[in-house]
């Protein structure tokens, strides 16, 4: 699993749409994200189909339930061949540890990372809606340390928190960043965004990009441009 490739978020309405989309890349091995929209519309078989087509799959369902339920869900997803899974760090250490137990024999090939704070969460929303009276970066840092203590491979975080997380967890703890927008793109419903190159220079280990690729007039060209910007930032 090469997590240094930009991960394409397949926020599409059906398995057919997803497979047609990846088919436009002429056999190129992609890393794609299956989130709630596609998974709930197409069912588990979409993960299997994407794997059979030669792609790595990030199954981003943000598991958050009692430990035994999350353990069972992680087991099911790992058997589908998912390379990367997400759980909510807010579920607690026991729940995160249970997700790893659920991997069984797939623990060598499937990694679990934790959601810290969604990139749509603003500092104001953290305080007024979640009633968390600490700076957003401190909340993210706390969740990252908790996830590492539970044995997870990394976290999902914005580029703005990536360097801070690396400072408390070490460089090998993954920092997977959504909310990526090429220069000049619309921000949409994201609150904390960055360009691919900026995310690399700010310490992200991997990036997730959806609409700037899937909604582009030429998705293949858009993907390659984002990949080039990302790689240039990583080498800088």
From Swiss-Prot:
Catalyzed reaction equations: orotidine 5'-phosphate + H(+) = UMP + CO2
EC category: lyase
Record's keyword annotation contains DNA damage: no
InterPro entries listed in its UniProt record: Aldolase_TIM (IPR013785), OMPdecase (IPR014732), OMPdecase_AS (IPR018089), OMPdecase_bac (IPR047596), OMPdeCOase_dom (IPR001754), RibuloseP-bd_barrel (IPR011060)
EC number: 4.1.1.23
GO CC term, one of those recorded: cytosol
Name of the protein in its database record: Orotidine 5'-phosphate decarboxylase
Organism per entry: Cutibacterium acnes (strain DSM 16379 / KPA171202)
């Amino acid at each position: 699993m090469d997590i240094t490739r930009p991960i394409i978020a397949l926020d599409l309405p059906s398995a057919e749409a997803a497979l047609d989309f990846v088919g436009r890349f002429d056999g190129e091995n992609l890393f794609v994200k299956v989130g709630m929209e596609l998974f709930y519309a197409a069912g588990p078989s979409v993960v299997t189909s994407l794997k059979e087509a030669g792609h790595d799959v990030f199954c981003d369902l943000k598991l958050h339930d009692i430990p035994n339920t999350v353990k069972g869900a992680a087991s099911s997803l790992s058997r589908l061949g998912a390379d990367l899974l997400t759980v909510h760090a807010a579920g607690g250490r026991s729940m995160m540890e249970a997700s790893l137990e659920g991997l069984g024999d797939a623990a060598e090939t499937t990694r679990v990372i934790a959601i810290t704070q969604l990139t749509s969460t603003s500092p104001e929303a953290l305080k007024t809606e979640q009633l968390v009276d600490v700076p957003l970066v401190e909340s993210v840092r706390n969740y990252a340390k908790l996830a590492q203590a539970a044995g997870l491979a990394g976290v999902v975080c914005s580029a703005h928190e990536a360097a801070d997380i690396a400072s408390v967890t070490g460089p090998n703890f993954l920092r997977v960043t959504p909310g990526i927008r090429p220069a000049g793109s619309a921000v949409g419903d994201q609150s904390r965004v960055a360009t691919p190159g900026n995310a690399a220079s700010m310490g992200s280990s991997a990036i997730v990009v959806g609409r700037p690729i899937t909604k582009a007039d030429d998705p293949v060209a858009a993907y390659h441009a984002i990949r080039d910007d990302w790689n240039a930032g990583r080498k800088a």
